[in-house]
Every structure is written in C-alpha cells, then in structure tokens.
Amino acid sequence: MGESWAARGAEGAPARMPLVLTALWAAVVVLELAYVMVLGPGPPPLGPLARALQLALAAYQLLNLLGNVVLFLRSDPSIRGVMLAGRGLGQGWAYCYQCQSQVPPRSGHCSACRVCILRRDHHCRLLGCCVGFHNYRPFLCLLLHSAGVLLHISVLLGPALSALLQAHSALYTVALLLLPWLMLLTGKVSLAQFALAFVVDTCVAGALLCGAGLLFHGMLLLRGQTTWEWARGHHCYDLGTCHNLQAALGPRWALVWFWPFLASPLPGDGISFQTPGDVGLVTS
C-alpha cells in the first residue's frame, strides 16, 4: 500500500533515529525475555508444561508485535500516490501550501513527515511515522500487544526481582528501583542485578504507557474521532459504536486484534467520510 517507510525519500537519517532506538530497546527486552524463558531465574522454577505454555504465549505475542510493526511501517498513510486533482470540491477540503495540493477532510500536514496525512491522528515519535487512515489498525494492535508483552515480561521477572529486594533494606529497594544506574556506578549492585531491575522498571513503565495509550485511542475509536478532533470537541463523524469500529478496523473488527495478517479491508478510502446523516443515525 504505497511506499514503505524505509523508501520514503523525504525522511532522512534523523527521522529514522527514533525507530532505531526503539528497535534497540525492543531487542534488549526480547533477549531478556528469552533469558527468562530458557533459564527461568528466581523462584518459583517453571515446570516443563508451564515453560511450554509460557514459550507458546511469548511466541504468539512477539509474532503479533512484530507483524503489526511491519504492517504499520509498510502502510503509507500520506497523500502520496493518491489522485486528489479535481476532487477538492466538497465541504471540508483545504489547500496545503507545503504540499501544493488540495487535501480532503480530516487530513493534516506533518512537519516531521513533510507531507499531508490522510485522516491524520498524530505523529508517533517512537516509530518515526504518522498514524493515519491506512495504519491506524496496526497502531492500535501494536499498543495492545506491546502492553501485553511488557506486562508478561514484568510478571516473569517479578519473582527474581522480589527475591533480590527481600534480601536488602527498604532504602536499598527504593534506590534500586528508582536509581538503578546510580546503584551500578557506585558498585552497589552487579551488572546482572542492574539489568534485572532496569528491564523490570522499563517494562512496567512501558506497559503503563501503552495501556494508557490503548485506553485513550480505544475511546477515540468508539467515538469515531481523531486526536485533533477530540481536542477540539468535534463529533462530526461519530456513526455509532459498531459503524465506528468497522470504519477503522474493517468488517472483521472483533478478530483483527488476535492476528495482524487477518484480511479485514477498510470500507473507506481515507478521502471521503460518512457522517451520521449519511447512515441515517441520530446523534445526541
């Protein structure tokens, strides 16, 4: 669907740096997860059946996570390659002087991507790309499975961290959780203990952030709003819960959360949008 993220000429190395840093952090988390799954440090030890189930769950979560990342980055949410000439006659159309093109309703120009985005929601700093009409579904699924993976890792590492903390004072516990780098530099913890505390801290914080993002965008999804429309109190495209879900996730909206490559084509084109009057709905 359009140009891939890596092939977009407008984005140089600085724009890709957030994705590189995110990928490095994700690699560290995956390695830590693999370490826990294989060696199972800390009490209680995992039995063969529990280990197999944990491995299956971890593999499923990682496949969903990586699959949605690939779909997100391969989907071009911009107006590139979209035939807009002669279509800017309806209500809500505007002219973008940066792109030198008519743009449809709900579109917005991104200074980072340097192009207008169809049904623009926001620019995702962690992935270095805008969230728009064509990649909103993988973005939502990415939030869900990111929170799940990070929470899973936190639970797996919990016993090992708990055993470490119980062997020391309360002050040591607070310092290790809040200032792991300082504890490492002062020689109060080993490198392995620092890595354990740092990864747990990062995963818990990441899970909370992803969970909060999922709740917020879930609210927008049910209301048929973008972040820009929510901030300004616009409800022009709220078609009701069921129609809003289908408009953003396709007809199989209830199943797309479980597998990233499930076919669920979007009913729209990102250029024209239905309003409550178009579908005969009455909004309060």
From Swiss-Prot:
| Membrane topology of this protein | Multi-pass membrane protein
Write down the chemical reaction(s) this protein catalyses.
Answer: L-cysteinyl-[protein] + hexadecanoyl-CoA = S-hexadecanoyl-L-cysteinyl-[protein] + CoA
Which Gene Ontology terms cover its molecular function?
A: protein-cysteine S-palmitoyltransferase activity
Q: What is its main location?
A: membrane
Ranges in the topological domain labelled Extracellular = 40-52, 159-166, 217-284
Identify one Gene Ontology CC term for this UniProt entry.
Answer: membrane
Q: Where is the DHHC domain?
A: 94-144
- State the EC number(s): 2.3.1.225
What are the UniProt keywords, alphabetically?
Answer: Acyltransferase, Lipoprotein, Membrane, Palmitate, Transferase, Transmembrane, Transmembrane helix
TM segments?
19-39, 53-73, 138-158, 167-187, 196-216
The residues annotated as the active site are C124 (s-palmitoyl cysteine intermediate)
* Class of the enzyme per the UniProt entry, highest EC level: transferase
- Chain ranges on the Cytoplasmic side, renumbered to this chain: 1-18, 74-137, 188-195
Tell me where it resides. Answer: Membrane
The domain section of the record reads:
The DHHC domain is required for palmitoyltransferase activity.
Chain's role: Probable palmitoyltransferase that could catalyze the addition of palmitate onto various protein substrates.
Would you identify the family this protein belongs to, as annotated?
A: Belongs to the DHHC palmitoyltransferase family.
Q: What is this protein called?
A: Probable palmitoyltransferase ZDHHC24
Q: Provide the taxonomic classification.
A: Eukaryota, Metazoa, Chordata, Craniata, Vertebrata
